[in-house]
C-alpha cells in the first residue's frame, strides 16, 4: 500500500543522506561482521527498520485473518506448553517486528508482558504503549538508568505469560559484558536473571 511504498522510498533517501543514526548503524554492522558494510546492506537495513515502524502504524487495522496470515510462528505450541507452568522468558535482539509478533501471540490466547524504553517525546512513548496495550500486551516502561526488575518479577510470578525482553542492549547501566560480533558489548541481564526466578 501507500504507507509501505512511502516508507520504502523515505528509508532509501534517509540511508543515502546519512547522519548520526546511519553512521551508528554502519559502525554496528561493521562490529558484527568485521568489515565495512556494502551500501546496499545499509539501505536494506534502514528500509527494514522503517518498515517495522510503518507496520506498527497499521497494526491496529490488522486483526484476525490479515494478522494471522502475516506471521509464521514455528514452535508456538511448545511455547504455550512451557508457559502453562509459569512465565516463559524470551531474550530477543533488536530485529524484526516485535509488536506484530506480540499481537499475534495475544490473538492466539497468550498474554505478553514486556518492558518498553521510555522514548522522547513522552507523547510518542504513550502512543506506543497504548497501541501495545490495545493489542493485548502488558507494558512496563523503563528509562535510562532505571530498574524495573522487581516490578517485572512481581507482575509475572505464577502467571502463564510470555515475557519477551530485548536483551542486546543495556540501558540500566547494570548489564553484563559479552562477546557480540567482533567486540565486547554491554547487554541487558534482565532476561537471564528473570528466567532464574
Q: Positions of the model-derived regions?
A:
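Soluble catalytic domains of membrane acyltransferases
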Residues: 60-197
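Membrane-anchoring hydrophobic helices of lipid-metabolizing enzymes
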Residues: 1-92, 97, 125-129, 136
Amino acid at each position: 500500500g501507500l504507507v509501505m511504498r512511502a516508507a520504502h522510498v523515505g528509508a532509501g533517501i534517509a540511508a543515502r543522506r546519512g547522519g548520526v543514526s546511519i553512521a551508528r548503524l554502519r559502525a554496528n554492522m561493521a562490529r558484527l561482521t568485521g568489515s565495512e558494510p556494502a551500501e546496499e546492506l545499509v539501505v536494506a537495513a534502514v528500509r527494514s527498520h522503517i518498515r517495522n515502524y510503518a507496520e506498527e502504524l497499521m497494526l491496529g487495522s490488522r486483526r484476525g485473518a490479515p494478522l494471522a496470515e502475516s506471521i509464521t510462528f514455528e514452535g508456538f505450541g511448545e511455547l504455550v506448553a512451557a508457559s502453562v507452568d509459569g512465565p516463559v522468558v524470551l531474550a530477543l535482539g533488536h530485529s524484526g517486528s516485535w509488536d506484530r509478533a506480540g499481537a499475534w501471540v495475544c490473538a492466539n490466547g497468550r498474554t505478553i508482558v514486556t518492558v518498553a524504553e521510555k522514548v522522547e517525546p513522552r507523547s510518542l512513548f504513550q502512543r506506543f504503549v497504548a497501541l501495545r496495550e490495545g493489542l493485548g500486551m502488558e507494558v512496563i516502561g523503563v528509562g535510562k538508568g532505571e530498574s524495573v526488575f522487581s516490578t517485572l518479577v512481581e507482575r509475572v510470578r505464577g502467571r502463564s505469560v510470555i515475557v519477551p525482553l530485548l536483551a542486546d542492549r543495556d540501558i540500566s547501566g547494570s548489564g553484563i559484558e559479552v562477546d557480540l560480533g567482533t567486540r565486547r558489548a554491554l547487554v541487558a541481564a534482565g532476561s537471564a536473571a528473570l528466567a532464574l526466578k
